[in-house]
């Protein structure tokens, strides 16, 4: 990827394989990678560990005002730290997944983290793949390539259910599907930065694609854009 394409924005609902696709794309392009969802999950861990009332947006904003967050932009690293302690595994736990929509809907926290995301991208001249839920619409609305990765709720639930079983985590497909649908509803109806594709985003539906096919489809979009700007 050349200097012409500094930011590749990748958005979409949970369970689409977005993080893996974005990481693999960044690795293949020699680009940096930023998982903004991990930031909101880290903020959620901070709120949970400090016993903040998740029904009180003012309390969440106050507790996360100076979030001591550190993350790696290496696509091969999953480093996420809070106050010097790794939370890379903790951010994926069920209580965090259940609470992250409430925490990430707080406007003051979103403003703080959007500022952080823009600063990270500007900090280095190396191109960066940034993935989340509002990258193409809010964080980098001028990104030359915006990808909206989607899949049916059923396909996403099936993937997560399979992943849970492989990890030895007790899993019930119907419960996983209900969780996916609930998260979709919360993310798409929140007042600040609701989940939606940017008007000029390329929509990639991965319902019937393997992970490798999805990565190839996004890499092809990048290559075609590169050709068009040369």
Report each predicted region and the residues it spans.
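Residue-level signal for inorganic ion chemistry
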Residues: 37, 84, 113, 129, ...
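P-loop (Walker A) phosphate-binding loop of NTP-binding proteins
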Residues: 13
């Amino acid at each position: 990827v050349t200097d012409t394409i500094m930011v590749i924005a990748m958005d979409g609902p949970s369970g689409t394989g977005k993080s893996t696709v974005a990481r693999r794309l960044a690795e293949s392009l020699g680009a940096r990678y930023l998982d903004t969802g991990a930031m909101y999950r880290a903020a959620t861990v901070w709120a949970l560990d400090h016993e903040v009332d998740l029904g009180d947006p003012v309390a969440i904003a106050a507790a996360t005002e100076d979030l001591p967050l550190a993350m790696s932009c290496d696509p091969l690293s999953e480093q996420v730290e809070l106050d010097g302690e790794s939370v890379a595994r903790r951010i994926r736990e069920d209580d965090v997944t259940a609470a992250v929509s409430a925490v990430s809907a707080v406007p003051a926290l979103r403003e703080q983290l959007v500022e952080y995301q823009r600063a990270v991208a500007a900090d280095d001249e190396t191109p960066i793949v940034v993935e989340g839920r509002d990258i193409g619409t809010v964080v980098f609305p001028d990104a030359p390539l915006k990808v909206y990765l989607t899949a049916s709720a059923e396909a996403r639930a099936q993937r997560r259910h399979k992943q849970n079983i492989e990890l030895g985590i007790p899993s019930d497909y119907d419960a996983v599907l209900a969780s996916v649908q609930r998260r979709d509803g919360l993310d798409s109806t929140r007042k600040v930065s609701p989940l939606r594709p940017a008007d000029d985003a390329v929509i990639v539906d991965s319902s019937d694609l393997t992970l490798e096919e999805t990565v190839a489809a996004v890499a092809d979009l990048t290559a075609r854009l590169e050709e068009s700007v040369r």
